[in-house]
């Protein structure tokens, strides 16, 4: 079993690197604002049609453009969901969502979280899925990538005040990266058996003679961008454990690769844009090391099995509870770590049914800020925040002003870095405390003791870090939970983006200093170790007390 697990991990990472490197070169061209081959003429027509100029923006203008787009999308999506019953392509005549659920869902998809407090097949029409959720899957992914483009330009430019044109970046990212890759993935899913239609639900008679209603809809198109954009919101309630979303072992592998594809490619793009590919590889090595260790721990925990089930006479020594037999324990464990290392949140198994330690690792990966590959764009700019913190710590140890890629890291950058890193831990800890202190929060818990607290902690961690997965034993569709998690999702997204853009605005105006003998090399094994240590240290100091009350206490309570 151990050999199979490591072979699965190695094969997955090898295929990922082969696919990510050429995509990284394309992303690097977009960072440099160089049109991809053959599309320059198309872009000129688009700019004239859309009224987009070549005028570059400073960080405030760039940020304002992104906030305007996202707030407008939030309002439109809320209206689509709230008045769903009056809109077309609703063959099941599903009613509109309540105001709190519509708000929660709109915030969720605009912030790239895709937390779902509803069952998709019994709540949303085809129109809501296509015109509402799928559109936001593209726009939220493009927003994250645009932010990291601006931050990368801040390191590669000097003595200027502009970071590019947000509207051009958003259009290029959507049309030349997200759409074509998502189209290829969607066609593959259709070939594998994923539905893509606008039909009403189909009544059938099962082998036992019972009547059943099979949900239909444009599943493949939404599934593709759901994974590629690290969105994660399922067309069906069971998400990627549903055979209509993830029917085969091949689609399961393709979904995991799609989740990591752009985050890994952005590391290569960062190295090319910085003029030193070793810089991007260093970040990729750091992410990969943490990822492999986490996958190994989850696989080990799930292979050990659940003592309660073993004592009850379960016919399997491994923990197959909540897992699909067509995937098995190893592929389910790998998927769980992939989806929580990235801010995706799609699931092919129920994380609530994992062992205590097996469920703790995905929770902790979210809590450290979704920086192990992370979401599209957000993972890299989150890791770059830890890079700035690591060079600051190194500068304190050797008595030098910290710098990264030749840019001096001053007080302003460190204040913004600290703010961005502290936003999500504060939301997680304060939000969990509020839920446990109120009757409205506790009433949603379906399990007592440490596991019940773990469900609450997981939900708030998922929302604040824009992941979207859940320990399903929490009845979260209530005004209290919908409003609390909507607030966490919104602040967790834009409360990080705003200081990141402020850092970019500060760095882009600085001169690149030539390296000297005392300059810390940020591409070697020493710095990779320092970066990993910084990520682990922040995660450990912040969340060990909370984890001790939840999954750790649950683990030690097992026989």
Swiss-Prot record:
Keyword Membrane belongs to the record: yes
Residues passing through the membrane, by range: 5-25, 27-47, 63-83, 132-152, 170-190, 253-273, 283-303, 327-347, 356-376, 379-399, 416-436, 484-504, 524-544
Keywords: Cell inner membrane, Cell membrane, Ion transport, Membrane, Potassium, Potassium transport, Transmembrane, Transmembrane helix, Transport
Membrane topology: Multi-pass membrane protein
GO cellular component, one term: plasma membrane
Annotated GO MF terms: P-type potassium transmembrane transporter activity; potassium ion binding
Highest taxon in the source lineage: Bacteria
Family, similarity comment: Belongs to the KdpA family.
Role played: Part of the high-affinity ATP-driven potassium transport (or Kdp) system, which catalyzes the hydrolysis of ATP coupled with the electrogenic transport of potassium into the cytoplasm. This subunit binds the periplasmic potassium ions and delivers the ions to the membrane domain of KdpB through an intramembrane tunnel.
Subunit structure: The system is composed of three essential subunits: KdpA, KdpB and KdpC.
Protein name listed in UniProt: Potassium-transporting ATPase potassium-binding subunit
Annotated gene: kdpA
């Amino acid at each position: 079993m151990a050999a199979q697990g490591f072979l699965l991990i190695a094969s997955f990472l090898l295929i990922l690197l082969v696919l990510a490197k050429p995509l990284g070169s394309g992303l690097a061209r977009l960072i440099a604002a160089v049109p991809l081959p053959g599309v320059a003429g198309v872009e000129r027509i688009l700019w004239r049609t859309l009224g987009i100029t070549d005028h570059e923006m400073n960080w405030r203008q760039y940020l304002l453009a992104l906030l305007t787009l996202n707030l407008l999308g939030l309002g439109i999506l809320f209206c689509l969901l709230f008045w769903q019953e009056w809109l077309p392509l609703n063959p099941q005549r599903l009613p509109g969502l309540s105001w709190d659920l519509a708000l929660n869902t709109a915030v969720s998809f605009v912030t790239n979280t895709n937390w779902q407090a509803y069952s998709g097949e019994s709540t949303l029409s085809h129109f809501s899925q296509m015109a509402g959720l799928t559109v936001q899957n593209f726009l939220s992914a493009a927003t994250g990538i645009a932010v990291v483009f601006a931050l990368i330009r801040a390191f590669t430019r000097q003595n200027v005040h502009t970071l590019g044109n947000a509207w051009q970046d958003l259009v290029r990212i959507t049309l030349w990266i997200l759409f074509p890759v998502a189209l290829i993935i969607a066609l593959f899913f259709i070939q594998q058996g994923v539905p893509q239609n606008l039909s009403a639900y189909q009544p059938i008679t099962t082998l036992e003679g019972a009547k059943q209603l099979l949900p239909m809809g444009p599943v493949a198109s939404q599934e593709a961008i759901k994974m590629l954009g690290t969105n994660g919101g399922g067309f069906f309630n069971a998400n990627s454990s549903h055979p209509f979303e993830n029917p085969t072992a091949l689609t399961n592998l393709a979904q995991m690769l799609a989740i990591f594809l752009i985050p890994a490619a952005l590391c290569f793009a960062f190295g090319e844009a910085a003029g030193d590919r070793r810089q991007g590889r260093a970040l990729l090595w750091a992410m990969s090391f943490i990822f492999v260790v986490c996958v190994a721990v989850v696989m080990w925990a799930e292979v050990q099995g659940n003592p309660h089930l073993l004592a009850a006479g379960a016919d399997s020594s491994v923990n197959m509870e909540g897992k699909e037999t067509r995937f098995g324990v190893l592929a389910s464990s790998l998927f769980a770590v992939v989806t929580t290392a990235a801010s995706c949140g799609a699931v092919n198994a129920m994380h609530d049914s994992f062992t205590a330690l097996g469920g703790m690792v995905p929770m902790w990966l979210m809590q450290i800020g979704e920086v192990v590959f992370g979401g599209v764009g957000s993972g890299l700019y989150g890791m770059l925040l830890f890079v700035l913190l690591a060079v600051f710590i190194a500068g304190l140890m050797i008595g030098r002003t910290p710098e990264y890629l030749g840019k001096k890291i001053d007080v302003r950058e460190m204040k913004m870095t600290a703010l961005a890193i502290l936003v999500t831990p504060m939301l997680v800890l304060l939000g969990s405390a509020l839920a446990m202190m109120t009757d409205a929060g506790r009433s949603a818990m379906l399990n007592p003791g440490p596991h019940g607290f773990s469900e609450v902690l997981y939900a708030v961690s998922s929302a604040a870090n824009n992941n979207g997965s859940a320990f399903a034993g929490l009845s979260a569709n209530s005004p209290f939970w919908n409003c609390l998690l909507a607030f966490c999702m919104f602040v967790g997204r834009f409360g990080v983006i705003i200081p990141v853009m402020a850092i970019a605005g500060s760095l882009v105006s600085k001169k690149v200093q030539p390296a000297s003998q005392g300059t810390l090399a940020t591409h070697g094994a020493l710095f990779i170790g320092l970066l990993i240590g910084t990520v682990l240290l922040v995660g450990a100091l912040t969340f060990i007390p909370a984890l001790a009350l939840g999954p750790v206490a649950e683990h030690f309570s097992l026989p």
